[in-house]
Amino acid sequence: MTEDVMNDDFDSLVTKPTEFIDYNCDINNGFNDLLKSQKFDKLGFNYNVLSILGCQSSGKSSLLNSVFGLDFDVMNTKLGHSQTTKGLWGALVIPKDTGSGNVTIVIDVEGTDSRERGEGRLTFEHRSALLCLAISDCVVINLWYHSLGNLTGSNYGLLKTVVEANLELAEASENTLASGDYKTVLCFCIRDWFPELAPLETVRQKVVNEYMLGIWNDINKPDKFKNSKLEDIFRFELYGFNHALVHPDEFAKDSSRFRLAWATSISPKSYSRAVPSDGFFYYASNILQTVKDQSHLDIPNQREMLANFRCQEIKGGVLDEMVPSISSMLTDAQSGVMDDFQHRAVELVDVAVGKYLELASRYDKTTSNKIGNELVISVFSKLQPVFDAIISHHCSDLAVRATVRLNEKFAISGKERSPMVGGQKAADVWPKFNMLTDEIKAELYNSLNSHILSCAINYSHESGIQAQSDFDTSAAVDMFNVTFKNEVESVRARHIRALLGQITDLVDSGFKVIGEALLERNVTSDKYWGDVNDLIDRAYSTCLDTMGPCYTGLVPSVQPNEFEYLAFMILLQATKCNLERTESRITDIILERFEQFFQYQEFNGETVPRDWGSYTEEELKQTYTQCKKEALNIVAVLRDCSPPTLEVPAFEVSSLKPNHVLYQELSAGVDSLRATTTSLSDEVLVDTVKACRKRFQEFFRTAQQIQSSSKNGISWKNIPPPFWILLLLCSWNELCSVLRIVFKVQVLIPLIILGFIVVQYFSHLVFGTSADAVFRPFKRQARELAMVGTKWIFKVATSTAAAAVNAGAKTTFLSDDDNDSGKKAEEN
């Protein structure tokens, strides 16, 4: 205690006097600093307050200095009489032995009847008297013995002010007078007295029975005190003090006697105003401000205000202390390692309430419990981020569970035309899609709600403090809804694509049949495009009958005619894609038609290959020209587009919301799909004819070769000698390669020869001459096979030579005929 003044003559420590109330009747915060420096706020109710009232220059400060060993400023009489103490000053008297008594706040009050104060002295005297009576366990009245009997010198006016002020305090209190809560101790200290003048009992009778009782009878008392006695309001004590200068030793003994009486009998065991030490300064400040503003006091209201102020302060301090623990919990929650949130939260609240009650329990219980409830609610509020982190992890787990459940329930398997969803037919599952997803959502939401309830806290403390957690779950619910919706939308989109794929497949499968019709000889524009429109009509009817309920189940909030319009769009789109695909392979179609018409013919209702050997050269040319013309006719069929005859369903695309799952597809419209243009332009047609010309010629030349071979027969004699020389020269490398391979087989050939000799030798050895009869047929067959192979080789060579001879003669016909075909194709 740096400001303590050691006093060997006393068993206590004291502080230097500090201004409490300044000359303008304003409280000084420096006094609060003094209290804090001495850890006064830790005392609880174990302290007392003593103040002294009396006339100016009556020796109040010197009396307090003598009794408690303090160092209040005193008047120097050698310099004349003047005002020394201005305002109120205070000091602490602290027992050296903490168990020997309470700490005492000693307040030295500016003297009354001050000439320096002038006309404002009465106001200050009233305010200071009210303040001292409100905050003091004991008010010392300093009187001079020789002034007893005088009106002014005996402080009669001051005593009257004290009585009236104390009545005002008692009237404002809700406590009964008999309880003793507001029985302020009035201790009269009679100065310059010694026993030879008059016994103290006589002086007591004079002061109490004449002065105080006279004042009691003269003042106007409130109705509740009409029948009350003076002793119901005050407790009187009286002590005599010898002359300090004439009899200093006796004065010192009298001071010691009063100090002992204060410590043993006068001072209460605890502060009688029931204000904890940490709230004393604020209580005194509020009392002074109320006296200045209203000139009267409402003590219970002041206590309630003090309790509310201090408890709020304590609550704020406790919340600050809880921040590290809450941060630690938040870290654990964010890392996903907290499984005991409720237990840890209750422990945290218990610690907070314990710290709070350590100080707040000294104040009004109703107020402290009310703010204690607020403390618990504030702790719950600070735990909101922890709660959010825990629920966020649980929502992530629920998202995984949602994905698993949705994939199990809506797994697509099977063929495209008859898909299975979750082991059931898609047509049975899709109409109930929204209902099934709602069931899964309800199951997962129940899990979320159970987890939220497991984190709820209904806190109750033995002190009466209780509160229930009210964590904001809106963020958790929103997170769950968004997460589940995203999972559902992903599955929904996948199944809608599967449904649209089925609609498209209706057209694709139909075009496979229509594509076969393009190879027919008698195909026409009316027949082809009629088949296309019939396919669209059938597919559209099938969509409405079997897929409408599926679409309604998959897509929420379906507008009237929405599916009809969408199905029409998908069918047109699929039709357009198939037509474009057909047009892109026009060259292959033409070649397939030509090959089918040119290479095959109808015979007895069956398609058989043509026997070109039976055709004359003119018939071959006519057949070639006719087949080429029929093959190219398909171009005119494809170019003669016919728009769909199906009427477009009436549907307002503007009625769709932008968040519709198929908004982009439906917004495209059908106008572009109903266009009658074709990609087979004149330029494309010319390129197509050029690409087909070479293949046509190859087919024709092959037919000519077969025809020539059939007419000329196969004979090596018909082949001119120069051809043999040319053949020998061209195939010389191949012959050498064959010979090298044969001669390289140096082991196989000897083995074959050796095997033949061994078999023949042993056969003759065993069977004799009859063995020749057995081997002769095998030798004859081997020679025949060799001759057949040789004849076949000569036949192929002869045919090749004949074709080469006749090729030049036919080139002019093919060239002229192809030019005519190109012109006809361009006209088509």
Curated annotation (Swiss-Prot):
Residues 1-718, 764-828 are cytoplasmic. Its main location: endoplasmic reticulum. Gene3D superfamilies: P-loop containing nucleotide triphosphate hydrolases. It is a multi-pass membrane protein. GO terms for biological process: endoplasmic reticulum membrane fusion. It comes from the Eukaryota. PROSITE patterns: G_GB1_RHD3. The chain crosses the membrane at residues 719-739, 743-763. InterPro entries: G_GB1_RHD3_dom, P-loop_NTPase, RHD3/Sey1, Sey1/RHD3-like_3HB. It is found in: Endoplasmic reticulum membrane. Residues 740-742 are lumenal. Probable GTP-binding protein that may be involved in cell development. Belongs to the TRAFAC class dynamin-like GTPase superfamily. GB1/RHD3 GTPase family. RHD3 subfamily. PANTHER family: PROTEIN SEY1. This is Protein SEY1 homolog. It comes from Babesia bovis.
